[in-house]
């Protein structure tokens, strides 16, 4: 992170509370950071794993108290921003084949990343973008839209653009509902 009130100053110095934070993610492989999300904790998504910086009692993260913990070893797809939904974080797996929900587990005192598209992964074809529309009343859940790529030939073939196919997921965690469908447009 940068120095307080100096957003482009990432130079580490005396490790004062308002100094920049420099942390190395200790893993057995090189992992490029794909996204950051601030929620219950600071979540760090990489190509090979997910990490989090725990934040106890709403104390700010500083150079003297920063700790990075490993959450899961799934990896997230580059270019698709994770979405916050009902206390969890939805993200696409690094291969673009599974929609996962990163959720804190009180039993494990860490995050788990469950595959919520297990029964409908065939609807996700080369995902290009994701967007979430939160539910607006008590009779509907959150709606996650995943824009698929151009190629529908073969099993998840690589593509270069958008052909008009969208995978839609209605999510309602309290009722344990994940309802998936597809929308087709003219492109």
What is the meaning of each model-derived region?
Residues 1-21, 51-63:
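Beta-propeller domains
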Residues 24-187:
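Beta-sheet-dominated scaffold domains
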């Amino acid at each position: 992170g940068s120095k307080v009130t100096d957003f482009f100053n990432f130079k580490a110095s005396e490790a004062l509370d308002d100094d920049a934070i420099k942390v190395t993610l200790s893993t057995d492989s090189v992992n490029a950071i794909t996204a950051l999300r601030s929620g219950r904790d600071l979540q760090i998504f990489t190509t090979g794993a997910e990490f989090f910086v725990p934040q106890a009692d709403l104390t700010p993260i500083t150079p003297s108290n920063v700790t990075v913990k490993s959450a899961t070893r799934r990896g997230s797809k580059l270019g698709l921003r994770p979405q916050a939904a009902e206390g969890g974080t939805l993200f696409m797996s690094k291969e673009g084949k599974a929609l996962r929900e990163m959720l804190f587990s009180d039993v494990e005192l860490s995050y788990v990343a469950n595959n919520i598209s297990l029964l409908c992964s065939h609807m996700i074809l080369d995902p290009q973008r994701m967007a979430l529309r939160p539910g607006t009343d008590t009779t509907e859940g959150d709606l996650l839209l995943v824009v698929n790529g151009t190629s529908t030939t073969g099993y998840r073939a690589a593509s270069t653009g958008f052909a008009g196919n969208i995978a839609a997921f209605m999510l309602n965690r309290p009722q344990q509902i994940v309802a998936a469908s597809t929308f087709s447009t003219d492109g």
